[in-house]
């Protein structure tokens, strides 16, 4: 499999340190509110990557964190008159509901930042002892950016350019606490009304960037195979993670980096001020969760993706085509007699090959979806004339592919009541006798009972309304 490595800006063969075992870290949410549709993109994209690696027979150690200590959480708690911990616990639960609704597998480990304070302090000590960090006069601890000659290698930004052109960095030069405006906090001295922990530098709390470094090192080791997140995290978050991790550990932090693109709404950047800000829950309440997952797979993960109502409705319609196809397969397989055409077997193998080729090409989910619909077309054309073995091969390929994409998870098998079966048989007899009035009346009765009947070449096909 080839992936685009942000570090080298090129596609590379994705080779783990240990053959058959991938160690992956994905930056998770800061749980101060419901996640928006932009937050859902990395959640779905990298869950799909994990599913594909596992489908190909690999073991994946997948760590995705919960940021439960942050300025935004503190502010939210102050606004609500409650504690940061209560805010974090409430919105972590809501995040987990959304993640489950989107059919994202649970991470191997889902660590919380507040549960890793000692591990964070261990890295801070390593950085101070090695001269890469220093304690300011107020008890803040800052990473000394100029001590790392490789700083900027992920974002491809030069330190001189940052210092001269970044007003934000210059404004962070607070009362001469920092040696350099580019230096960033790995530990923040306590402020009144904020949560704090004991440390050798006085009461305080961790900086944002070092939380991920500590959780990654604790659960995946000093060097991981892949680090993932949104493109907005490349600088400063991921750049700072690399600097502090490699300076503390003395080795490479992550061998590969993958970053997903942004979500726009009606071709505009999503923002509350433009009133085009949608949470996952907002969209799911109208369309369900599965169309959101499908939507995220319709474009290459590195490309911008434009959210519109028309597109999400189109995604819902595409999913209905998949569900209808699978129902038709079940119906064809339920028959007692089958035809003789074996060609659907080869079509199933062809779809599987196309799917894997697409996924091996930097997680090309649009082409992967195209492979699914190629198979749908063949199933719809050939199912009536196929052998049982060919139908089973098609069903197996269809289920494998859609499972890797995380789709078709709302599929249900409805038990047909005896009364409904009896009515279907009576309707078939009425049609055979050309008693159309009775046949139509029975169809209407079935509809009232919540069942749709479709006449096919293989006989009447039932589905739950």
Where in this protein do the model-derived segments appear?
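Short phosphate-binding/catalytic loops that engage adenosine nucleotides
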Residues: 58, 132, 451
């Amino acid at each position: 499999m080839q992936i685009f490595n942000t570090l080298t800006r090129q596609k590379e063969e994705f080779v783990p340190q240990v053959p058959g075992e991938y160690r992956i870290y994905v930056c998770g949410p800061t749980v101060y509110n419901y996640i928006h549709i932009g937050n859902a993109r990395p959640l779905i994209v990298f869950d799909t990557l994990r599913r594909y690696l596992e489908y190909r027979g690999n073991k994946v150690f997948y760590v995705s964190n919960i940021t439960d200590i942050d300025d935004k959480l503190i502010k939210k708690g102050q606004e609500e008159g409650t504690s940061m911990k209560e805010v974090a616990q409430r919105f972590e639960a809501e995040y987990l509901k959304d993640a489950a609704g989107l059919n994202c597998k649970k991470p191997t480990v889902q660590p919380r930042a507040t549960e890793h304070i000692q591990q964070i302090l261990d890295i801070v000590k390593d950085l101070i002892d090695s001269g890469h960090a220093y304690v300011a006069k107020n008890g803040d601890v800052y990473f000394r950016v100029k001590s790392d000659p490789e700083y900027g290698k992920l974002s491809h930004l030069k330190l001189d350019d940052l210092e001269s052109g970044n007003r934000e960095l210059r404004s962070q030069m607070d009362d001469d606490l920092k040696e350099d405006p580019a230096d960033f906090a790995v530990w923040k001295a306590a402020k009144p009304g904020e949560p704090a922990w004991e440390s050798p530098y006085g009461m305080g709390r961790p900086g944002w960037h070092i939380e991920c470094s500590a959780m990654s090192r604790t659960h995946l080791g000093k060097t991981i195979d892949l680090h993932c997140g949104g493109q907005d995290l490349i600088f400063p978050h991921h750049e700072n993670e690399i600097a502090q991790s490699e300076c503390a550990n003395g080795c490479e932090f992550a061998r590969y980096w993958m970053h997903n693109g942004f979500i726009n709404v009606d071709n505009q950047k999503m923002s509350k001020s433009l009133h085009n800000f949608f949470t996952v829950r907002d969209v799911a309440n109208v369309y369900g969760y599965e169309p959101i997952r499908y939507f995220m797979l319709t474009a290459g993960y590195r490309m911008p993706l434009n959210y519109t109502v028309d597109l999400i409705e189109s995604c819902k319609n595409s999913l209905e085509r998949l569900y209808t196809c699978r129902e038709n397969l079940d119906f064809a397989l339920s028959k007692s007699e089958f035809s003789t055409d074996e060609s659907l077997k080869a079509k199933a193998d062809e779809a599987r090959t196309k799917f894997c080729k697409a996924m091996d090409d930097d997680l090309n989910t649009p082409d992967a979806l195209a492979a699914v619909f190629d198979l749908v077309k063949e199933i719809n054309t050939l199912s009536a004339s196929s052998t049982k073995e060919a139908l089973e091969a098609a069903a197996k390929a269809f289920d494998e592919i859609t499972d890797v994409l995380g789709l078709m998870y709302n599929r249900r098998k409805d038990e047909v009541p005896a009364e409904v079966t009896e009515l279907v048989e009576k309707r078939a007899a009425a049609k055979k006798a050309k008693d159309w009035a009775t046949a139509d009346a029975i169809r209407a009765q079935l509809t009232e009972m919540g069942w749709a009947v479709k006449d096919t070449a293989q006989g009447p096909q039932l589905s739950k309304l």
